[in-house]
């Protein structure tokens, strides 16, 4: 589970990571993970420090490839994308040959909303339990604290937003370049944002105040 909270403890210098990415012949399949462990600095003891890096989700995809009956790609398409009715998307291939997990996937806004609803509905979509509710609860929990203002679960961020001098909880999926799925449990609201801008800090601060006044808390 540490790889899903960005606490694998693997530390590889950027120049060495570039060498690994360029050595495509020797990082196919599970050899990618082997290369990570061969080239990392010594891994510290638990609890390990949070480090936001592409290595940890790459290992997660390798684990998925090892445990599902088919390939990770086939499993994701059959058990998630098809059941969410997501047909138009781009999910690039990693150098390992597996689906790229750190970044790079592209979907329509309407399909990003479906991912948000899947989480909001505790793993259910169209009446079918696609992901166990207990896993969704843990994934969106504050399992570690990368900073004073943000906590982190299994690839989900959590922070507190200020709305007219009142606090509200917010869970987010944050993608490169300003791709967001915001979940506001108290208001029962899912918001999707797409953009091509670097720097997500201002949006995280301003969006709740502009959207949530129109959606009072449901409890």
Write out the residue ranges for each language-model feature:
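Structured C-terminal helix/loop/strand segments within mature extracytoplasmic catalytic/sensor domains
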Residues: 173-219
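Solvent-exposed loop/turn segments at secondary-structure junctions
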Residues: 10-11, 57, 96-99, 123, ...
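Structural recognition of the beta-strand scaffold that forms the well-ordered cores
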Residues: 2-5, 51, 88-92, 106, ...
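Active-site-adjacent helix/loop patches that line small-molecule binding or acyl-intermediate pockets
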Residues: 1-86, 109-113, 117-121
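Solvent-exposed loop and edge beta-strand segments that line ligand/cofactor-binding
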Residues: 43-52, 99-106, 173-180, 198
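Active-site-proximal binding-pocket segments
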Residues: 76-77, 81-140
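Active-site Gly/Thr loop motif
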Residues: 86-90, 136-190
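Charged/polar, low-hydrophobicity segments characteristic of intrinsically disordered regions
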Residues: 1-6, 89-102, 145-159, 219
């Amino acid at each position: 589970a540490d790889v899903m909270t960005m606490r694998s403890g693997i530390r590889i210098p950027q120049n060495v990571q570039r060498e690994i990415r360029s050595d495509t012949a020797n990082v196919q399949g599970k050899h990618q993970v082997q290369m990570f462990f061969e080239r990392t600095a010594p891994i510290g003891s638990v609890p390990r420090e949070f480090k936001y890096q592409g290595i940890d989700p790459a290992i997660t995809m390798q684990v998925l490839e090892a445990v599902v009956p088919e390939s990770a790609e086939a499993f994701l398409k059959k058990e998630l994308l098809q059941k969410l009715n997501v047909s138009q998307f781009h999910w690039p291939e990693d150098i390992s040959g597996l689906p790229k997990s750190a970044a790079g996937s592209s979907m329509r806004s309407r399909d990003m909303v479906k991912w948000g609803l899947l989480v909001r509905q505790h793993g259910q979509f169209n009446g079918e339990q696609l992901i166990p509710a207990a896993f969704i609860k843990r994934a969106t929990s504050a399992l570690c604290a990368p900073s004073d203002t943000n906590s982190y679960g299994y690839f989900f961020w959590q922070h507190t937003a200020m709305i007219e001098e009142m606090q509200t909880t917010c869970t987010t999926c944050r993608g490169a370049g300003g791709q967001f799925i915001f979940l506001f449990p108290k208001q029962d609201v899912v918001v999707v944002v797409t953009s091509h801008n670097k720097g997500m800090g201002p949006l995280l601060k301003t969006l709740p105040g502009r959207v949530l006044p129109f959606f009072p808390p449901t409890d």
